[in-house]
Amino acid sequence: MALTLEQKQQVVAEVSEVAANAYSAVAAEYHGIGVAKLTKLREQAREKGVVLKVVKNTLAKRAFEGTKFESMSDRMTGPLLLAFSMEDLGSAARVIFDFSKDHKALETKLVSVGGVVYGPEELERVSKLPTRDEAISILMATMNAPVTKLVQTMNAVPGKFVRTVAAIKDAKEAA
């Protein structure tokens, strides 16, 4: 069933809004995956803060105009499933990568992060990017390390002094 002009405009507006707020996007060819498996993929995506859209490429190209995913437009061919990361950079890549391990029919075509389009070979690398919480904890650990080392160094001096005095005392008692 063909979409009316109003329906097409609504689809373009929805995808454009999602793309404007997304951190990254993954385009994957889904040909050969059944409805039940796609439904399972959608459930997994929702849990991870990923929005999945199946849209005609011409409508997706219009929706991407003026967004950081505009560079994907000229490389979109075939029936594509678009996954948008709404919470962190790697969430869409993580969902698609994990799902494609078990379902070889889901074939990644494009990965876009920060306006740069990568090929399917970069999907695993993007999927391993830390989540926002993980990145914050890594940053905090890095910032905390010099202070921790300083405290350990400052505690080492009195500790060495006490051990030296104890060794002298033990040596005098033994003599």
Swiss-Prot record:
One of its GO terms (molecular function) is large ribosomal subunit rRNA binding. One of its GO terms (cellular component) is ribonucleoprotein complex. It holds the Pfam family Ribosomal_L10. Gene3D superfamilies: 3.30.70.1730, 6.10.250.2350. The keyword 4Fe-4S does not apply. Keywords: Ribonucleoprotein, Ribosomal protein, RNA-binding, rRNA-binding. One of its GO terms (biological process) is translation. SUPFAM superfamilies: Ribosomal protein L10-like (SSF160369). NCBIfam families: PRK00099.1-1 (NF000955). HAMAP family: Ribosomal_uL10. Forms part of the ribosomal stalk, playing a central role in the interaction of the ribosome with GTP-bound translation factors. Belongs to the universal ribosomal protein uL10 family. Part of the ribosomal stalk of the 50S ribosomal subunit. The N-terminus interacts with L11 and the large rRNA to form the base of the stalk. The C-terminus forms an elongated spine to which L12 dimers bind in a sequential fashion forming a multimeric L10(L12)X complex. PANTHER family: 39S RIBOSOMAL PROTEIN L10, MITOCHONDRIAL. This is Large ribosomal subunit protein uL10.
